[in-house]
Swiss-Prot record:
Transit peptide start-stop: 1-66
Biased composition (Low complexity): 462-488
PROSITE patterns: DNAJ_1 (PS00636), DNAJ_2 (PS50076), ZF_CR (PS51188)
The protein's name: DnaJ homolog 1, mitochondrial
Subcellular location: Mitochondrion
CDD domains per record: DnaJ, DnaJ_C, DnaJ_zf
Domain J: 86-150
Species the sequence originates in: Schizosaccharomyces pombe (strain 972 / ATCC 24843)
Length: 528
């Protein structure tokens, strides 16, 4: 009666009589009474136009009580629901049939009902049914799902990908998105497994890869140049020797996961009508867990223990600072405690960062090495031989005359070897001319003579060497003064100005003849 009423509403036909609507409304009242709903007696009084409106409202309440909703569509019909048939009956095989028997039966029926061989419309529908049945039975997962849950594991002919045991027990192992996403891993939304970033899944067994370890080691400059072998100690997770990585005590067994009921999957609902299936985070998708009283006492059920490990690292010649070396299989061991009976594991890798100490006087630039050599100015001017250190020992270098600061000598092929090749860089010697800041009187005298010899008029001289005169002039004037008995005391600027006047000449002569008379001229003037 309810379906007839809906049909009449969808098609726009109002063929219900007052008596029919009254009967429907009476049934809804009786149903509401069984559900302990109180309906006012005044609602039983209705008339021609209100009959259908009240009946529709009461039927909506009845549908809500039965957890059922309907949608009236006037123009577009919903897609027909595909009712799945028994694939075993379709192919004519038993549930214990092998894969080869199922395949043989499929080829036999497909050849018989193929549209090219049988153009009948019924044969085409039969061929589609045969193909769908074979797709279910040839896939081990789909076959297992159908054997366990029947057609409920398929929606509109499509495999949902998970077990549906939770529907029989109040959606066990499922959680709602409206309740704070408990137990939901967002990585599964994008295709990542919740079993950890290092877990890789296979159709027949699980392979667990341990986490990688990062460490650092410091070496000397010459060890990086020549290569070395260094020992590195670090903390690592190793497989437990008591349980061999299973996490169980001897003779113990795993139990079914309580969160997912052994399915390894959890179902999450997205209102209004979407659902998502993710890997169970309690068991890691295996469907089994280790009971607390069965866990290994050495590793507490984890399958791994922490310990110190030492590995020997071969450092190749020519390695540079901050270079990372990879040691395969020297990382953490993977635990198989959450894996299945065929789970396998592989340790991670060790990534060692090499730090090179700086050298006191060698400067590295890639494979080239630079050494700054300091030479005195006499060697720079006259040339000579200089002993400098290199990567292979001391070497005597010839310094060309006139070498200045910034000049460079290149020793090709004497640098650092390029890693994993036979090529070497260059060794450069940069010259830096050093000049003394403090001079002895003898050194200053020699330099002044050198300045005179080079006609360097800008060099500063002491008082014994008048500026602006060369060595020959000073020598001749000195000899003439000694021959005449005249002192060689230096003269001031005022006296030089008076050299050309007669008064100046007699004044100087008087001072030389009567030195006592001129000791305190100011005093004589004051007394007079």
């Amino acid at each position: 009666m309810f379906s007839k009423y809906l049909q009449s509403r969808v098609c726009g036909l109002h063929s219900f009589t007052n008596s029919s609507a009254q009967q429907l409304f009476s049934k809804s009242i009786a149903h509401s009474s069984r559900r302990n709903f109180v309906i006012s007696s005044s609602c039983t009084k209705f008339r021609n136009v209100a009959i259908q409106r009240n009946a529709k409202r009461e039927f909506s309440r009845c549908a809500a009580l039965k957890n059922f909703s309907y949608h009236a569509r006037c123009f577009h019909a919903t897609r027909a629901v595909w009712e799945m048939t028994d694939p075993y009956k379709t192919l004519g095989v038993s549930k214990s049939a092998s894969a080869s028997e199922i395949k043989s039966a499929y080829y036999k029926l497909a050849k018989q009902y193929h549209p090219d061989a049988n153009p009948d419309k019924a044969a085409q529908d039969k061929f589609v049914e045969i193909k769908q049945a074979y797709e279910v039975l040839q896939d081990p997962k789909k076959k297992k799902a159908f054997d366990t849950y029947g057609a409920g594991a398929f929606k509109n002919g499509e495999f949902t990908g998970g077990d549906f045991e939770g529907f029989q027990n109040g959606f066990a192992g499922a959680s709602s998105f409206s309740s704070g996403f408990p137990g939901f891993n967002f990585e599964d939304l994008f295709g990542f497994s919740s079993r950890g970033p290092q877990a890789r899944r296979n159709t027949s067994f699980d392979v667990f890869v341990g986490e990688d370890i990062e460490a650092s080691i410091t070496i000397d400059f010459m060890e990086a140049v020549r290569g070395a072998k260094k020992d590195l100690s670090y903390s690592v997770s190793s497989t437990c020797s008591s349980c061999h990585g299973s996490g169980l005590q001897p003779g113990s067994h795993k139990s079914t996961c309580f969160a997912c009921k052994g399915t390894g999957q959890r179902l999450h609902f997205i209102p209004p009508s979407f659902h998502m299936q993710t890997t169970c985070d309690s068991c890691g998708g295996t469907g089994t867990t280790i009971p607390p009283n069965s866990a290994c006492r050495s590793c507490m059920g984890s399958g791994t223990v922490r310990e110190r490990k030492t590995v020997s690292i071969d450092i190749p010649p020519g390695i540079d600072d901050n270079t990372v070396l990879r040691v395969m299989g020297a990382g953490n061991d993977a635990s198989t405690a959450k894996g299945g009976p065929n789970a396998k594991s592989r340790p991670g890798d060790l990534f060692a960062t090499i730090h090179v100490r700086k050298h006191p006087f060698f400067v590295r630039e890639g494979t080239n090495v630079t050494y700054n050599a300091k030479i005195p100015m006499t060697t720079a001017a006259l040339g000579g031989t200089l002993r400098v250190p290199t990567l292979t020992g001391n070497v005597d270098l010839r310094v060309s005359p006139g070498t200045s600061t910034g000049d460079r000598i290149t020793m090709a092929g004497k640098g650092i070897r390029k890693v994993n090749t036979s090529r070497y860089g260059n060794f450069y010697v940069n010259f830096e001319v050093t000049i003394p800041k403090i001079l002895s009187p003898h050194e200053r005298s020699l330099l002044e003579q050198l300045a005179d010899a080079l006609n360097d008029s800008t060099a500063r001289r002491t008082q014994s060497s008048p500026s602006g005169t060369n060595s020959s002039t000073s020598t001749s004037s000195t000899s003439s003064k000694h021959s005449t008995g005249i002192s060689t005391e230096p003269t001031t600027g005022e006296e030089n100005k008076q050299d050309g006047s007669v008064g100046g000449f007699f004044k100087r002569a008087f001072r030389r003849l009567h030195p006592d008379e001129d000791q305190n001229p100011k005093k004589d003037e004051s007394s007079s």
